[in-house]
Design a protein with these regions (language model features):
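Conserved, helical-rich catalytic subdomain that frames metal- and/or nucleotide-binding sites
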Residues: 49, 143-242, 251-256
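ATP-binding N-lobe of GHMP and related small-molecule kinases
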Residues: 1-100, 118, 122-128, 163-164, ...
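Glycine-rich beta-strand-to-loop/alpha-helix junction loops that act as flexible
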Residues: 104-105, 242-247
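DPxDG-like acidic metal-binding loop motif
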Residues: 100-129, 142-144
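Structural motif
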Residues: 6-8, 149, 246
Length: 256
């Protein structure tokens, strides 16, 4: 199964909820860049309590796919899921850069949930999978829906399909690892007074093409300023737009 990257056409902070930040954002699937995830029969049996994940890159810390697996084990299909992964491994082919604002980890978790649901015929609805994903990561819900474009709000759990007009986009990822918690913490400490609820509301109704034609990059992503405060050498040209918490940015290919 392909596990696509995402871009944030705009990302506005609208408030806080405990340690989380409420957002209003346009997410689009960026289908030119994707990881692949699939299941293969294992050569030996596992405990069924943790996944055997084979990847082309080293994954540090707690793997978000394993986190998704643990959430699935809390459902009524615990034994079917555990039994399957005693004899199967997860193969992950990574192409999406990590710490780049492209949602690679969240996309992998969603692809794992969707693929497990299909492979084991669990018949979870998208709504049920989104509920399962709430303890995994805030961007996972968008990827579960498989929408090409959506307005995402709350802390990422509200995903509304959007009939969009998306120009051809080109993505660039500089060699700067962006820590999402660090960028959000910087926004909370230094930039909360920049919240613009009126603009956040206005952007939701516009197509991606209209947004990129009408607005400046610093108006569209509230995380650009804290990212640049932490990485002062990072500069964008006028026709370049910041995605997520960085460090990736994108621009329109050709004329809009």
């Amino acid at each position: 199964m392909k596990s696509y990257a995402k871009l944030n056409i705009f990302l506005k902070i609208t408030g806080t909820r405990g340690n989380y930040h409420e957002i209003s954002s346009r997410f689009i699937l960026y289908k030119s860049l994707f990881d692949k995830i699939y299941f293969e029969k294992s050569e030996f049996q596992h405990s069924g309590e943790d996944l055997n994940i084979i990847s082309n890159i080293k994954i540090n810390g707690e793997n978000i796919i394993n986190k998704a697996f643990k959430e699935l084990l809390k459902t009524k299909f615990k034994y079917e899921i555990s039994d399957f992964f005693k004899t199967h491994k997860v193969v992950l082919e990574k192409n999406i850069p990590m710490g780049a604002g492209l949602g690679g980890g969240s996309s992998n978790a969603a692809a794992f949930l969707n693929l497990t649901n299909q492979t084991l015929n669990l018949n979870f609805s998208k709504k049920e999978l989104i509920e399962i994903s709430k303890n995994i990561g805030s961007d996972v819900a968008f990827f579960i829906t498989e929408f090409e474009s959506a307005n995402v709000s709350g802390v990422g759990e509200i995903v509304e399909n959007f009939n969009d007009d998306i120009p051809n986009l080109e993505v660039f990822t500089p060699s700067i690892f962006a820590s999402t918690p660090e960028i959000y913490a910087k926004f909370r400490s230094d930039f909360m007074d920049k919240i613009d609820l009126n603009l956040a509301k206005k952007l939701k109704s516009l197509s991606t093409k209209e947004i990129l034609k009408k607005y400046k990059n610093y108006e569209l992503n509230d995380l650009l300023a804290p990212f640049q405060a932490i990485n002062p050498n990072f500069k964008l040209k006028e026709n370049e737009f910041f995605s997520g918490s960085g460090s990736s940015y994108f621009k329109i290919k050709g004329k809009i």
